[in-house]
């Protein structure tokens, strides 16, 4: 039974009539709901000072009626830019040493508008605003110096990498503004895959990511069967801009459903052009705060799915579409074909059950917002080329074995409308709680405890009315089966993942193990939900 906890239901009728009628229309028109800066922060959240909503050279903040820029206001159609690559400062074999500086950078984005101040890794004002690609190999000793030039504390979380707990950028390990921290870890054999990095300070993760702080990681293996293939990187993010070029603050609907900017970007650009002159290996990242990407070509042409978060799996799978929840990654093989053609890489319509305001205000109000419509990501021109031989077997993914312990994670939510209607500080919504096992996140409180090296079976149960992507730090896991509406479906293939979507009313069972003692986080990867408490701590002993 799906359960959403409602408090102060006496407000429902009046509140629903006030808000529900215009909520979806306003979202579709992208007028936003900008004037929510006065909402009370949650009592159990640390005091993170948000950046000013305008964040632009002392310009006035957008007023409550400030509208968003039109969905076609950003230029489109430029050739897809290659990602910047983080330079290795070391000359020692097997050592990768580099520096990442997080800082505000003004960039000219919207024609006719003032420069937009992004937060990014590096000072570049041209080229992709995405953080630089960290390109490393299994066995490398990695040492990255992080310099925080932001107005907030921050961290770097190495999403999916098997790094020690004290090197993983957990929210309890903050780097103060103006401070420096060095992260050190070694990449073990078998860790080749497609990863990414982003901040993880509690109650500021969403803001720091939507302002631009995220970047890709590729870990390579010496025995990669696709090493000789041309490789293309597509880092998908989104951006929510006001008409004057300012990054718009979160409104109540952003906090409730997760923020989706009106601009979907690939390597920092809107709808770029890709020219395919032969078969290619693509690595695709969903670096959005909340947007789901059901990627496909608009003409239905198939492609091969060859890898997940943690790298290649056993054999290629031919598919016509592939769902990537926020935080997920995929490796694909895209064929040029035997004749010239064109297709649009598209994020197809997907219904993740986003709440309408009326749902939040009344237990009797059922339904949700319409599905996100299809969205073009890139235009792809295919030039004919001889096909490359794709190996029938890619990489063995051995079964983890029988579990010796079992865990359960339950996603839930609670809306207190009396609190949500009160004015407060910092734009944080009071009374909106996203929970794990009935509680919101508290630093250092162990939600679950595991023993190092033990194989465990985890069941992730979604008792809310919308999808939530589950992410577990410090390891990769294997999805075993999914159960919804009383029907259990075994996972059709074995793969390494660190993020998996859990649909409303669904139970997903995974097998996992942790190799080092310490604190690991697990949470929903809709970043607003994570910030509002849908996160737990795993204590590994």
For the regions a language model picked out, list residue spans one by one.
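Active-site pocket scaffolds in enzymes
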Residues: 26, 113-115, 160, 166-171, ...
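Histidine-centered copper-binding motifs that mark active-site loops
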Residues: 26-27, 32-326, 332-333, 353, ...
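N-terminal export signals
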Residues: 5-26
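Short, surface-exposed ligand- or partner-binding patches at beta-edge/loop junctions that are enriched
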Residues: 195-198, 338-351, 515-526
